[in-house]
Amino acid sequence: MKEKTPTPMKNIRNFSIIAHIDHGKSTLADCLIAECNAISNREMTSQVMDTMDIEKERGITIKAQSVRLNYTFKGEDYVLNLIDTPGHVDFSYEVSRSLCSCEGALLVVDATQGVEAQTIANTYIALDNNLEILPVINKIDLPNANVLEIKQDIEDTIGIDCSNANEVSAKAKLGIKDLLEKIITTIPAPSGDPNAPLKALIYDSWFDNYLGALALVRIMDGSINTEQEILVMGTGKKHGVLGLYYPNPLKKIPTKSLECGEIGIVSLGLKSVTDIAVGDTLTDAKNPTPKPIEGFMPAKPFVFAGLYPIETDRFEDLREALLKLQLNDCALNFEPESSVALGFGFRVGFLGLLHMEVIKERLEREFGLNLIATAPTVVYEVHLTDNSIKYVQNPSELPPENHIACIKEPFVRATIITPSEFLGNLMQLLNNKRGIQEKMEYLNQSRVMLTYSLPSNEIVMDFYDKLKSCTKGYASFDYEPIENREAHLVKLDVRVAGDVVDALSIIIDKNKAYEKGRALVETMKELIPRQLFEVAIQASVGNKIIARETIKSVGKNVTAKCYGGDITRKRKLLEKQKEGKKRMKAIGKVELPQEAFLAILKID
């Protein structure tokens, strides 16, 4: 394959697609790829940008993918670099770093649904990065599409002029050519100095079984070639370049160099993505750039949960599996922990609940593990009486009550857009979740935008499911962490047969403790199988028992073998059984079924 002449910077366009879940982003990406003939019709599959099975099944994008497209317009050859971004709230860090490598973004809105909360959040990230925003109304072929109302909706909500918005249908392939031409004429070419020292931004990284850890980079200044030695500015380590490629969902395209303004994949032969952290800067080892690229924050976990293998001898397999997933996911972090009830496992940090579900599902599906997940928690700031501060993410680490001066919990600012008919139900839900209303505005007659501050631990349990059920699935939701605020929190323990089951402990608002404790013991009573001895299930705060249920013992007919009517013989056997039950009650261990741990997540 002969080496192509480098594309001049004025003919490069780097753009990304911002859209809410289900607004047709991946389908639109497929259309653009097909229109530019980047993939032959034979190899084209739907959602070609979503490479994980779990992405295709759930219809969501998790890892941001990129593709290089060639397009000829008015006799000139252009290179269009499309960076696909996830749309779900948990993956907004993927969005922010993808947007840093672009000059423009397509704001895709479903013609039947209008602007959603997540879209607004990501559009603001794009505007903060000074991106040119092109509004695109998708699904115009649907009978209930209302293009004029949606344009007005975008103008009112985000403040972007939509008089010339592109109207497309990715499914029916309408308006795709016009959209490509609009990208070329409207989105600015990349800026940067081709003669300056190399400065490249890593905006994604993943692990390849053959090439090791790969970095997806945007060249901001200078250029990179295969003979170069590279310095990773964050780690201070130097590496030789083993290979350079242009991104394509099916097969990477090798190249000798990546020029200023281009997007490409760099292989440095590294064993883990931790050596090429996302947001880090690559530069030339001999002639480094004076300052790395600014404005990047490492992804911080928001939710923590314990993951334990059901087969206790598979602890090492779980460690291996987590390490492999971490190669691809710099937001995932974990440390070993042990629980009296569940044995050895890991405390794992996630970006949010969807991230936690996806990781758990991948561990079970790709590595064949059976796992128990404990109730998710957030990080609490505990001020102790000796003026020190302790950060607690596991309820079992909470110090005794008499050592605590106060506890602060993290709050988030939640933005919710809902049809106005569900407003009453929604406000009731938010009040139950200890929400504080900050703002309420009507976007039009039928849609309302609410802004609330909420404690993080109220949204990590089941808030998303409840939000969807009380608005029949129509509300959309986005949040950003704001600050820690003082709260009245206590640790609620569950005791089974007198022993605290550490994996079931939760930190909860004091006013909700009795209600939750009552619900917990009642649910546990249903789930724990009857034993040969009586089992007490108690909920306690500190040393105070606040709720109790008893599982009656299974009666075994010990007198069945006694024929004839000797009552003393029967009495002797019954006394012996009573003694045995007493002893079992003292030393007996109760096996807790996995459903008991899952039940905690589902209890209001």
Curated annotation (Swiss-Prot):
GO molecular function, one term: GTP binding
Residue span, tr-type G domain: 10-191
Compartments in which it is found: Cell inner membrane
Membrane topology: Peripheral membrane protein
Any one Gene Ontology BP term: positive regulation of translation
PANTHER family: TRANSLATION FACTOR GUF1 HOMOLOG, CHLOROPLASTIC, TRANSLATION FACTOR GUF1-RELATED
CC terms in the record's Gene Ontology section: plasma membrane
Species assigned in the record: Helicobacter pylori (strain P12)
Protein name (database record): Elongation factor 4
